[in-house]
Amino acid sequence: MGEVRRIAKPFFPWVGGKLFLLPYIFQLLPRRAPRLLEVCGGSGAVTLGLGAGYAPLRVYNDIDADLANLFRCARDRPLALLRELDFLPLHARADFEVVLRFLNHGYDPNDFLEEELQIAEEYFPPMDRQEVKKLLVGRANLPDVQRAAAYYLSIRYSYSATGNSFGGRSVELRRFLGLLRRASDALQGVVVENKDCCDVVRQYARTGAVIYADPPYLEAERMYAPSFALQDHVRLHDCLCAPAARDSHIVLSYNSHPDILDLFAPDFYIVGFDRPNPMARQEDARYHELLMTNFDPGPMLNRQLSLLDNPGLVSSDRPELRILSAPTGRLPRVWDWPQD
């Protein structure tokens, strides 16, 4: 077995993050692909985890413009992002509310630029004055980085990473620095889009491409913005069944909702497992996690997960995937998976 590769992980908490699902998702993917499309990007766990060597073309997409901007800044300006976070210390609810006002276009930190430059002129000695003014002007010329830092703080310090209520969580700076550095490295060469997921599928899907979709779970992620209603799930289903995507390797993650099962079961294999549900009040409550594929996953379920060789993801006591249903509406494609 080769050298253990330390994978990149999401560098911020995220509602519905899929880090715990990665062993199951990777088990269903080919070893390599010409294209990787993560069309409902969220925390980007799949794109980050597979890394630069997985596909010549990798696309991360999310409909949330602030989230897409955060990924662009992490890819292109990680040091500027870190510096901007130093400008935005967040210690109390009032600080958090200022960040939300900025994100909601009710406050612009550059409104006080002239005043800050004047203060620097009056109170700093000449040598320090020029450095301070240069720093202030340089920061004002990076509105995308300012917004990315504010968005990160709104997630990191909010209750349950919802981005809308102060939770007062502490930050381990050393751990964050490591996460951001590895994420920035993994994002090099990634195309970051801010589009509707179906538009990305139509634009980038090709024969052999891997498409991973993790849409907001129906009636389970009400905190997600923008909303994703049942008709949006129908659009996604129809898009993935259209000719443009039919010859791609498609994997979706979903919750076990009757409307979702009725929608996808005729055209997709459904595999899943149960896990403890810490959010439920009932003791020993279980949560049903589903993965859906447009190919027969049977040959993959017994495949040893050596893609990552990472003991942090592969656990001997994790539940095994089970095939729950096979499509009835058409003859599904059975992929000839490469072993190397």
Give, region by region, the residue ranges found by the protein language model.
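General small-molecule cofactor/ligand-binding pocket signal
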Residues: 191-193, 271
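Long, positively charged, glycine-interspersed low-complexity recognition regions
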Residues: 225, 230-340
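S-adenosyl-L-methionine
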Residues: 1-38, 45-46
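Short loop/helix-cap segments at secondary-structure boundaries that form the rim of catalytic
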Residues: 50-53, 202-206, 260-266
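Mobile active-site "lid"/loop adjacent to the S-adenosyl-L-methionine
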Residues: 165-169, 216-235
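Conserved proline-anchored active-site loop of SAM-dependent methyltransferases
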Residues: 25, 36-50, 60-64, 152-159, ...
